[in-house]
From Swiss-Prot:
Encoding gene per record: folD
GO molecular function, one term: methylenetetrahydrofolate dehydrogenase (NADP+) activity
Keywords of this entry: Amino-acid biosynthesis, Histidine biosynthesis, Hydrolase, Methionine biosynthesis, Multifunctional enzyme, NADP, One-carbon metabolism, Oxidoreductase, Purine biosynthesis
UniProt-listed GO biological process terms: L-histidine biosynthetic process; methionine biosynthetic process; purine nucleotide biosynthetic process; tetrahydrofolate interconversion
Catalytic activity: (6R)-5,10-methylene-5,6,7,8-tetrahydrofolate + NADP(+) = (6R)-5,10-methenyltetrahydrofolate + NADPH; (6R)-5,10-methenyltetrahydrofolate + H2O = (6R)-10-formyltetrahydrofolate + H(+)
Protein name (Swiss-Prot/TrEMBL): Bifunctional protein FolD
Organism in which the protein naturally occurs: Nostoc sp. (strain PCC 7120 / SAG 25.82 / UTEX 2576)
EC number: 1.5.1.5, 3.5.4.9
Subunit structure of this chain's protein: Homodimer.
Amino acid sequence: METKTAKILDGKTLAEKIQKELTAQIIDAQAKIGRPPGLAVLMVGDNPASAAYVRNKEKSCAKVGIASFGKHFPQETTQTELEDVIAALNQDEQVDGILVQLPLPEHLDAVKLLHQIEPDKDADGLHPVNLGRLVRGEKGLRSCTPAGVMRLLAEYEISLRGKQAVVVGRSILVGKPMALMLLEADATVTIAHSRSQDLKSITQNADILIAAAGLPGLITADMVKPGAVVVDVGINRVSDAHGKSRLVGDINFASIAGVAEYITPVPGGIGPMTVALLLQNTVTSYLQTAKESGALDVK
């Protein structure tokens, strides 16, 4: 008897496709605007994982033609110092996107810092104004990870209209904006979280299951409806018996691949899409600013 295996939603390949599209857009626009798009990434301290993420973003920027303004601050940098830097970047005409790399040292207020970013330069799509635009169904910069999920589902022509969608996780980074974007696409949405009772009975009803709780292996095969679309947003670093670390998601990939219709891997699923949508947000801001200034014809 042939064993069924889920089709892979390949975020890495789609991210490369998006990067090529952005490169072409930038080449065309830069000839008229006279400068490339610019992304400022602010990092505080020496968290190795954060440093790796920042390097990856800078490398991706270079690949598509975005100027990267990396700013690395010592661990003891104060809230006021960072707010002053953000205020200057808000006024800098070379900068179209601003990103604060999380997590920050405990003495810093990340939410307050994010609020200082000019909404139209909010590359991560986390400013209250942009989240408010999402709630109202208005145009605005969208949170990168959930926007990446939506783009990946669209690429594979997975219909969401009328489907039962379950989001496991309620963070402002992923869970809440993810639920709103699914609602925008006419899905019927349930949000589950750490306080939800009988999580299994909730997830078993999902046609579309988004795991975004940050808990390795939380979702197992018996929690998944046969033929479901399972998207793993979790990025968790775990160590094996030999102390070697690796990245895993929130789902048990091997077992769920035998139940689901579509599945995303970790790594290579949503991670590359998050970076691609960060670049896209930066280019969107770049083009919008140019149109408003008259450097580009409004189309």
